[in-house]
Design a protein with these regions (language model features):
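Canonical Rossmann dinucleotide-binding motif of NAD(H)/NADP(H)-dependent dehydrogenases/reductases
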Residues: 1-30
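The beta1-alpha1 cofactor-binding region of Rossmann-like NAD(H)/NADP(H)-dependent oxidoreductases
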Residues: 36-37, 58-69, 101
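Substrate-binding pocket helix/loop in short-chain dehydrogenase/reductase
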Residues: 95-96, 103-108
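Active-site loop immediately N-terminal to the catalytic Tyr-X3-Lys motif
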Residues: 97, 144-150, 154
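Active-site helix of classical SDR
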Residues: 119, 155
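Residue(s) in the substrate-gating loop at a strand-loop-helix junction
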Residues: 139
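SDR active-site lid
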Residues: 172-237
């Protein structure tokens, strides 16, 4: 039987590229998204790409009933699920004193609790099956410490902690868990950006556009990592290098290395 895959935020960006890769392999692919027109168009693309069953179910990951509805539908129609990819997410930036509590609540509800909801409703299905794979899309921002992005960093760090916790918790049930931490790459994350600093938003857009890997390339690295059963999937070598430095170097040395990296990311006019 073909693999059964559900991807949140699957109508565009990284989620769409992941869906297309699985579709080309003949999988049964369901995408959930809040954008219905995009979702329907991507569903058509998945069918043309070779999915044995391509579906779009409107799904807002901040609404418990939406996520539960997807789980119930796929359990009934497909008899379960093999791969859950919690991909839906948004971006936020700004100095700690400038970002409102409402913006903190907004990003936490989507980036963290949206992932929690997916894990919560699909884990019982995986336990009944005795197998399954949860793939949570975090970010290198969850492993490193990018200034003026505290709300985003916190949600992604929490997704990393959730994932590694569940990897240990669910192992005895035959359930695998992977967490993906990409750096900047060419995607549409800027569409969701809430920022108190227009200059920072502009810089982020440039960094995303100048990423060395495309969304399709990142997606392929993820699919390969899932197939290999990796827990941490780090698509960018530069990000992995910084993470190793943070873990193993004295903090003073790591901090100097990281600050230098941050300076290179800034526009020339904003450096020093």
């Amino acid at each position: 039987m073909s693999q059964r895959v559900f991807i949140t935020g699957g109508a565009s960006g990284l989620g769409r590229e992941l869906a297309l890769i699985y579709a080309r392999a003949g999988a049964r692919v369901c995408i959930g998204d809040v954008h219905e027109a995009r979702g329907q168009e991507t569903q058509r693309e998945l069918t043309l790409a070779g999915a044995s069953d391509a579906r779009f179910i409107p799904c807002n990951v901040t609404i418990d009933d939406d996520v539960q509805h997807v789980a119930e539908t796929l359990s009934e129609d497909w008899g379960g699920l093999d791969v859950l990819i919690n991909n839906a997410g948004v971006a936020g930036a700004g100095a700690i004193e400038d970002v409102s509590i409402s913006d903190w609540n907004w990003i936490i509800d989507i980036n963290l609790l949206g992932v929690v909801r997916g894990c919560k409703v699909f884990t019982p299905i995986f336990k009944r099956q005795g197998n399954g794979h949860i793939v949570n899309i975090a970010s290198m921002a969850g492993l490193l410490d990018v200034p003026r992005m505290a709300s985003y960093n916190v949600t992604k760090a929490a997704v990393v902690a959730l994932s590694t916790t569940l990897e240990q918790e669910l192992m005895e049930h035959g359930i695998k868990v992977s967490v993906v931490c990409p750096s900047f790459f060419q995607t549409n994350l800027e569409e969701t950006m809430r920022s108190t600093d227009p200059g920072l938003t502009k810089m982020m857009n440039k960094l995303l556009a100048s990423g060395k890997l495309s969304a399709e390339q990142v997606a392929q690295i993820i699919v390969d990592g899932v197939r290999e059963g990796k827990v941490h999937i780090l698509p960018h070598a530069s990000g992995a290098k910084l993470w190793r430095a943070k873990r193993y170097l004295p903090h003073v040395l790591y901090s100097k290395m990281f600050q230098k990296s941050m300076q290179r990311m800034k526009p020339r006019s904003a450096r020093y």
